[in-house]
Amino acid sequence: MLEKLFKLSENKTDVKTEVLAGVTTFMTMAYILAVNPSILSAAGMDSGAVFTATALAAFVGTLLMAVLANYPFALAPGMGLNAYFAYTVVIGMGYSWQYALTAVFAEGIIFIVLSMTNVREAIFNAIPRNLKSAVSVGIGLFIAFVGMQNAHIVIGGSTLIELFSLDGYNQVNGVEAAFSDVGITVLLAIIGVIITGILVIKNVKGNILWGILITWGLGIICQFAGLYVPNAEVGCYSLLPDFSNGLAIPSLSPIFCKLDFKGIFSLDFIVILFAFLFVDLFDTIGTLVGVSSKADMLDKDGKLPRIKGALLADAIATTAGAVLGTSTTTTFVESASGVSEGGRTGLTSVTTAILFGLSLFLSPIFLAIPSFATAPALIIVGLYMLTNVMNIDFSDMSEAIPCYICIIAMPFFYSISEGISMGVITYVVLNLLTGKAKEKKISALMYVLAVLFVLKYIFL
C-alpha cells in the first residue's frame, strides 16, 4: 500500500529510510513549537492556544505536502513572518492581532488562486534576484535582533540600545531588574548561543532543538539552586512545566477564527498583505528549489516536477493556519535535514506530520520553555538567513545599494515591510536615473510596487 501511494521503489527509497528521515526533520524544526508561542504572545495572543494552532498548522500543512505533491518537505508557521506579524504589524503599527490574522488569511486565499495558475512563479521571476537575497538577509538580522531583545541581551538606553549590565542598574519593562531574575537569564542566553553554535558546528541532528532544551535545563538547575528567582514584573516565570491539567490540549477558542475584516481596503492593509505575500512567496519557492536540487529532484530543465501541488499545499496551509490562529505557514528549510537522511517521498512528510500531531499532548513542556532559551534559536536561525548575502552582486552598485538599504532598514526601523518598501523604491529610482532600467528589463510589477510604496510614505 505504501509502495503504491508514495512510489518508494521509483524514488529509490524504503519505509525505514523514509520514517527515519521524517523523525530527523521533526527534530530539526520542533523548536517552532516553543518559539512561535513565545513570539506571538508578545502580540497579546494566548500562548497555549498559539501552541495548539502551531502544531495543527504544521500537521495539516505537512500532510497536504505528502498528499498533493508526494515530497519530503515539512511545513509550519515560518520564522521571520511570525516576527513581522507580532513586532511590526501589531506592536509597531498598532493593529490588533485579529487584523494581522486577516492579512494572513487573505494572503493564503490569494496564494491558492495564484498556485492553481502559473502566476506565483511569474511574480517570483519579476523581482530582481539580488533583491530577493537581500530580503532574506534583512530578515535574518531582524530575527537575530528580536532574539537578543527577548533575552534582554540588548535593552533600551541612552544610546537607543545598549548591552544589559550583569552587575549594574537596568530597567526591563520599566522595572529595575536584578541579577537573580533578568541578569542570570542574559548569562544563560549567551551560554545557549555558544552551546547551539557548538552543536551546529558538530552537525548534530536537531541542533537548534537540543540547544533550546539544554539552555532550558541549565535554567531549571539555576532555579533549584536559587540563582534564578521568578519575577513576573520583568517577564521571568517559573521554568518548571505545569502539569496541573495533565496532558490536556490547550484550547483554541481564544484565537480560533478571530478575523477582523474592518479596514481591509486601506493602503496599510495592502502593504501588510504584500509583505506577507512577498516573503512567503520567495521563502517557499526558494526552499523548494534549494532543498530539491540537493536531492536531485529537479528535472533536466532545472524545474521541480509537481511544484504546483507543493505550492498549493503551502497556500492551503497558510489559509487554514490563519483560521486556527497563527501566522503564515510555510515550507521549512529544515526539511533538508530529512532529505540528507534519504527522505525522497511524501512518507517522510507523513511521519513528520504524525509527530507534530502527537506533540499536542506535550504542551506543558513546550509552553514552559522561556524566551532566554528560545533566543539562541532566533539568533542562529538569523545566521542561516544571513548566508544569502553571498548571492548579492556587490560589484554592481546599482544592485548593491538597493540591497544594502533593504537589509539595514529592517533591523534599524524594526520592520520587515519598511525594508522591502525602501529596497524596491531605491532599486527602481537608481536604475531609472542611471539609465540602467532598460538594460536590466525591470518588470512592470516593480514599477507598480515602487509607486504604491511612494504613495504610502506620502499619505500615511
What are these regions (language model features)?
Residues 23-30, 63, 67, 144, ...:
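Hydrophobic/aromatic residues within the transmembrane alpha-helices of Major Facilitator Superfamily
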Residues 2-36, 57, 78-87, 91-139, ...:
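Helix-loop-helix junctions within the multi-pass membrane cores of secondary transporters/permeases
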Residues 1-49, 167, 212-307, 451-455:
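Helix-loop-helix hairpins and the membrane-proximal interhelical loops
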Residues 44-63:
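Loop-to-helix transition at the N-terminal end of transmembrane alpha-helices
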Residues 38-49, 88-99, 266-270, 368-370, ...:
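Helix-coil boundary and interhelical linker segments in multi-pass alpha-helical membrane proteins
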Residues 58-79, 110:
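Juxtamembrane transmembrane-helix boundary signature
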Residues 12, 16, 191, 270-274, ...:
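Alpha-helical membrane-protein architecture signal
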Residues 93-214, 350-460:
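Membrane-embedded alpha-helical modules
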